[in-house]
Curated annotation (Swiss-Prot):
It comes from Lactobacillus acidophilus (strain ATCC 700396 / NCK56 / N2 / NCFM). Coiled coil: none annotated. Keywords: Aminoacyl-tRNA synthetase, ATP-binding, Cytoplasm, Ligase, Nucleotide-binding, Protein biosynthesis. It catalyses: tRNA(Gly) + glycine + ATP = glycyl-tRNA(Gly) + AMP + diphosphate. Transmembrane segments: none annotated. The keyword Ligase applies. The lineage of its organism: Bacteria, Bacillati, Bacillota, Bacilli, Lactobacillales. GO terms for biological process: arginyl-tRNA aminoacylation; glycyl-tRNA aminoacylation. Tetramer of two alpha and two beta subunits. Its EC number is 6.1.1.14. This is Glycine--tRNA ligase beta subunit.
Amino acid sequence: MAKDYLFEIGTEEMPAHVVPRSVSQLADRTRKFLKENGLKFKDIKTFSTPRRLTILVEDLAEKQDDIDEVKKGPAKKIAQDADGNWTKAAQGFARGQGMTTDDIYFEELKGTEYAYVHVQKEGKKASDILLGMSEIIKAMTFPTKMRWDSNDFEFVRPIHWLVSLFGNEVIPVKILDITAGRKTEGHRFLGDSVVLANADDYEDALKDQYVIANAEERKDMIVNQMDELVKENHWQVKPDRDLLEEVTYLVEYPTVFAGSFDEKYLNIPDEVLITSMKDNQRYFEVYDENGKLINHFIAVRNGNKDYLDNVISGNEKVLVARLDDAQFFYDEDRKYPLSHFVDRLKDVSFHDKIGSMAEKVQRVRMIGDYLAKRWNLPENVVKDFDRASELYKFDLVTQMVGEFAELQGVMGMHYARLAGEDEEVSVAIKEHYMPATAEGPLPETTVGSLLSIADKIDTIITFFGAGMIPTSSNDPYALRRYAYGIVRILLNEKWSLPFNEVLPEIISLLNGVTPARLPKSDVDQEIADFIRDRVKQYLQKNKFKYDIIDAVLASSQQDPSQILAAANVLQLHHDDEEFKPVVESLTRIDNILKKAKFKGNVEVDESLFEDNSEKELYVGVQNLQEIESLADLYQGFVQLQPVIDQYFDVNMIMDKNEKVKNNRLAQLYAVSELADRLGNLSKLVIK
C-alpha cells in the first residue's frame, strides 16, 4: 500500500531569492534518492516559505519490490579452474549478488556453460530507507551557507525543526541534535506549533496557523488583493514579475495594503521615486488611469489585517525618510552647472590600472568620432555625440547617484534636460549603459547607440591592455556582456565593423593621447576573437542551426553584420533542392585547392583558356564579384553551379602544363574567395 511522505526543514528566515531554488533542489535530490533506492512514487509536490522547505511525496511505496531473478555470470571455464576450484571471477560474481559460490549453478547457453545464481531478496521498507533523508540535507548547496553553535555542519540558515511523516508514522531523520517528528511551526507571530496526525494534514493545519505553505497560492492571494485595491481606487500597477516573486517568498501569510506620501515629492524624477519604493522597500508604485505616477504605493504585509493602520503608518514613515534624502540630493545637485561635475571626473578612477574617468571620456570621444566617420553618420549626429561624450559620465559624482547607484545614466539624462541640453544628448547619456543585461533593451537613438558602442569598445580594449582578460570561469568586469552588447547594437543598427581592421586602427589612434596601457598588436586578434565569440552567442540565441554557425564563423569574415547576413542566407536556403549540389560543388573546389596547397598568388590569364567552359566560369565569377548582397551572391552560385560542374567535366585541373594548371587553380581560387563570404561551407551538414 502506498502512502504520502512529508518532509519539512524548518529554518530561520531565508533570503527570498534562495527559497524557490532551494525547495526545487530538495525535490530533485529526493526524486533521485528514491529512484536510486527503488522506491516507487507518483509525484513530488513542494511547499516553501521564508522559514521552511517542504516536499510531499505522493503515493510512496511502503517497500522496495522483492527481487526474484536469475543472474548470469562468467562462463564455466572462467568460473572454475581445471581442478574445479572456484576462481576469483566466480567469487566476485557471487559476492556482487550478495551470495556465495555455494549458490552458483551452471546451465548451457548456445553451446557454452555459464554460471548462474537465483537471487531472491525481500525489498527494504521505505521507513528504513527514508532515514537517509539526512544525507540529502547535508548534500544541499547554496550561494552562501551558515554555521551555528559549535558545529561544522552548514546550511543556508540555522535549522530549528524537522518534520518527517510517512502517512502517520514518524521517520526519525536526524541532523545534529534535531530529530524529526510530527510537530511543525505556524506563523512566527500569529500562529502556534502544530502536531500533525498525518502527512496529508500539512497544508490545512498550517493555514489555521496563518501560514500559506503553497507559494503559488500566496502569489495568487497577493495578485487578487492588489487587483481589488487597484479596481477600488481606479489605479494602475505595472506588472513586475520579479518583485511579485520576491514578496511572495518574503511572507508566509500575505495581506496587501496601500499607503501614500506627500504630493510634493512628485517633483523628483519618477525613477528616483520608483527606486525608493521598489528596490529599497519592496513596494509596488501606483499610477493613475492616464499612466501618471501618483503619491500612493502598494505593499505586502507578512500577517493578517490586525493593526493594519499601524503597519501602513510605519511603512509610510520609512518611505518618507528616504524621499526626504532623495529630495535633498536632487536640490543640491541642481545648484551646480554640469561643468562642475565634468571637472570632477579627473578625480574619479575608472580603474586603478587604467586611469581616471576623465581620461576614459577623452578616449570614448575619439573612438566615437572614428566610428562616425567610418559609417558616414550625419553632422548633427556627430555634433550631438561629441557633446554627449563630454557629459556622459558626469552624474557619477552627483549626490543622487552616490546614494542611488542604479540610477547612473538616468539621472544624467534628467540633469542634462534641466540644464537645457538637446534631447538627443540627454537621452544618449542614459542609453550608453544599454543593454544593461545580455538581452536587455537596446538604445533607441543613433547617438545613444554610437556612445554605447564607443564606451564598451574602450572598456574592452583598456581591460585587455591592462591584462584583465576574462577566463572561462571568471569575468568580474562583465566584458562578455559588453562585447555581446556591441554585437547586438551593431546588428540592430546594421553598422559594418570588421574588428580585425578596426581594432588596430583604434588602438593606434589612442596611443600617445592617453596614459592607459593599450594592447599590443599581438592582442588585437585576441580581442577580435573575443567579440567574435559573442557573435556565436547571438546566433545560438536566435536558433541558427549549429552547422551554419560553425560555417559562418569559420570564414575569414570579421564583420558581425556580414556574418549574420551569411547565416540568414544559409538558414533560409538550407532545405532547398539546389542547396546540396551548390555546396558540394563549392566544397569540391576548396578540397582541390587545399590538396594543391594553392595560395592564390596567380592572376587568371584568359590566353591560357583551352575550352569554352573556362571562359564561362571566368565571366560568371566576374559577375559575382560585382554583387554586394549575400542573398544575391547565393542565387548567383545557384546559377553558376552547372557551369562549375561542366568545368570539372571538361578540364583536367592538375594539367601537366604548369601554367595551365596554375591558371585553372587561380580560377577556382576566385570562386573560393567568393564562397568564403558565405562561410566555410565544408562545415555544413548536408543530407
